[in-house]
A protein has these predicted regions:
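Conserved mid-core segment of classical short-chain dehydrogenase/reductases
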Residues: 69-86
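Rossmann-fold cofactor-recognition segment
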Residues: 21-27, 31-49
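Catalytic loop of short-chain dehydrogenase/reductase
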Residues: 87-89, 107-143, 150-182
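Conserved NAD(P)H cofactor-binding loop of Rossmann-fold oxidoreductase domains
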Residues: 64-74, 112-113
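NAD(P)-cofactor binding segment of oxidoreductase domains
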Residues: 50-55, 82-106
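Conserved catalytic-core motifs of eukaryotic protein kinase domains, centered on the activation segment
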Residues: 32, 74-79, 119-122
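C-terminal helical subdomain
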Residues: 94, 148, 167-251
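Canonical Rossmann dinucleotide-binding motif of NAD(H)/NADP(H)-dependent dehydrogenases/reductases
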Residues: 1-20
Length: 255
């Protein structure tokens, strides 16, 4: 997501844009994120990292894109514990509130997904609750203007994590309590089961939203749409289809 945001900023504003990117991890000598003016390394929850962000461009920002996410996946959203949700929120949601409070920023853009489709309800775990928190925040009035890009399945840390956990669990399909998931792995290799699981997501997305197989180019186009409209709340992208909406996806309506 961060790459798509940077590319869209450069397309819209050219070299005039002054961009800082925060890389969640240890500093690697010689490594810089392409397209930005400054790369900052470290955990966004580290006070020193926040102070460095405040020192950039006199602490004034037109737009902040918050794409960092880390939380438990691979289990049903309904089975996420309060502890796992709190841990997921620590990096996936809570920093958004902190940054909005501490920075002088006009617009904050966060990211979500279609976590209420059947396949995601079965596997998105605590991250599903963090994404719901983001969507509820998106429709609230705040110090900054709020917006959210909601995307269909694409290759990401979360999707890789889900596949890795399912691959391990697939060795004993009887332990998969969800009948839909279990059907993908019974009598099949873990590789084949994962493939069928992904195909199931794509099929469900296409039936629900009109397209599927979201690519890096699609994410880039969604960011360009963000700049095109005056005050969008949700910019949805699923495959080549991009559309606006203004209501959050609430888990209570689907669980």
């Amino acid at each position: 997501m961060g790459t798509a945001a940077i590319k869209a900023i450069r397309e819209k504003f050219g070299d005039n844009a002054n961009i800082m990117a925060n890389w969640y991890g240890k500093e690697e000598p010689g490594f810089n994120i392409e397209g930005v003016n400054e790369t900052l390394f470290g955990d966004i929850n580290d006070p020193q990292v926040l102070e460095k962000i405040k020192a950039f461009n006199n602490g004034q920002f037109d737009t902040l894109f918050y794409a960092t996410a880390l939380g438990e996946v691979g289990v049903p959203i309904s089975e996420a514990t309060p502890e796992s949700i709190a841990l997921s929120n620590k990096l996936s949601f809570d920093p958004i509130l902190k940054l909005e409070s501490e920075l002088d920023v006009k617009t904050i853009v966060a990211y979500s997904t279609f976590y209420v489709i059947r396949h995601q309800l079965a596997t998105y775990g605590a991250m599903g609750h963090s994404k719901e928190a983001i969507e509820k925040w998106a429709v609230e009035k705040g110090k900054a203007r709020h917006a959210c890009i909601r995307a269909g399945l694409f290759e990401s840390q979360s999707s890789r994590g889900i596949k890795l956990l399912l691959r391990k669990t697939a060795k004993h399909p009887e332990n998969l309590r969800d009948p839909l998931l279990r059907s993908y792995f019974e009598g099949k290799s873990s590789k084949e089961g994962i493939q069928k699981f992904e195909e199931g997501i794509f099929k469900e997305e296409k039936e629900a939203y009109g397209d599927c197989r979201t690519t890096a180019e699609d994410l880039y186009q969604a960011h360009l749409k963000l700049f095109k409209y005056k005050e969008p709340v949700f910019i949805n992208v699923c495959g080549k289809r991009i559309w606006l909406s203004d209501a959050p996806l609430l888990l209570k309506d689907y669980l």
